[in-house]
Amino acid sequence: MATPHINAEMGDFADVVLMPGDPLRAKYIAETFLENVRQVNDVRGMLGFTGTYKGRPISVMGHGMGIPSCSIYAKELITDFGAKVLIRVGSCGSVRHDVKLRDVVIGMGACTDSKVNRIRFKDHDFAAIADFDLVRNAVDAAKAKNINVRVGNIFSVELFYTPDPQLFDIMEKYGILGVEMEAAGFYGVAAEYGAKALTICTVSDHIRTHEKLTAEERQTTFNEMIEIALESVLLGDK
């Protein structure tokens, strides 16, 4: 049954959903990588699609920016539309000199300055982590394509324009691979409702050096990340 945010029915979404933040990215993924595509959501312009990749049903759905928006769509996909596996595919910024532009980062764990997981976990710390099998399959898929990936902790910030740049020094000290805005809450939702989740990001900006990918570089690296995500799903079916 449709929700206030998704005008679809049970069965419209596959059990595996790739989730970029930008709904136009969802459209691009569906049109570029999937076959037999049909649109299954357009509420508030948050586009969702279902198709097949090498014969395997897969859906793609935007989630917007930040933990609150991402959490709404992730929760409803799980509880109202039967999603079992959610893979966030997005971009992140680097705070480390050894994590470069175009690197692909797999978020094994996600730190955050958000309180959402403390709210759901009775004010205790919750270790927001990805599903191990999804991490392993993504690493194996990247190796098969000779794409180097970095695996470790990322950081989900509440504020894109942070008033405390010293936080980046602490992130670097603790080995944070990338900074984004969703993964910690995304993992919390998956844990609460019994689904598996993974975040894969490409480094599009370097917070220290102020380097940024060109539009062409961003697209090429984005495609590599999507290929890793899709191939990892096939590995998970074996």
Swiss-Prot record:
GO terms for biological process: purine nucleoside catabolic process. GO terms for molecular function: purine-nucleoside phosphorylase activity. Pfam families: PNP_UDP_1. It catalyses: a purine D-ribonucleoside + phosphate = a purine nucleobase + alpha-D-ribose 1-phosphate; a purine 2'-deoxy-D-ribonucleoside + phosphate = a purine nucleobase + 2-deoxy-alpha-D-ribose 1-phosphate. Disulfide bonds: none annotated. A purine D-ribonucleoside binds at H5, E180, M181, E182, S204, D205. The record marks R218 as: Important for catalytic activity. Phosphate binds at G21, R25, R44, R88, V89, G90, S91. It comes from the Bacteria. Its EC number is 2.4.2.1. The active site is at D205 (proton donor). Keywords: Glycosyltransferase, Transferase. It is an enzyme of class 2 (transferase). InterPro entries: DeoD-type, Nucleoside_phosphorylase_CS, Nucleoside_phosphorylase_d, Nucleoside_phosphorylase_sf. One of its GO terms (cellular component) is cytosol. Belongs to the PNP/UDP phosphorylase family. PANTHER family: PURINE NUCLEOSIDE PHOSPHORYLASE DEOD-TYPE, URIDINE PHOSPHORYLASE. Homohexamer; trimer of homodimers. Catalyzes the reversible phosphorolytic breakdown of the N-glycosidic bond in the beta-(deoxy)ribonucleoside molecules, with the formation of the corresponding free purine bases and pentose-1-phosphate. This is Purine nucleoside phosphorylase DeoD-type. The gene is deoD.
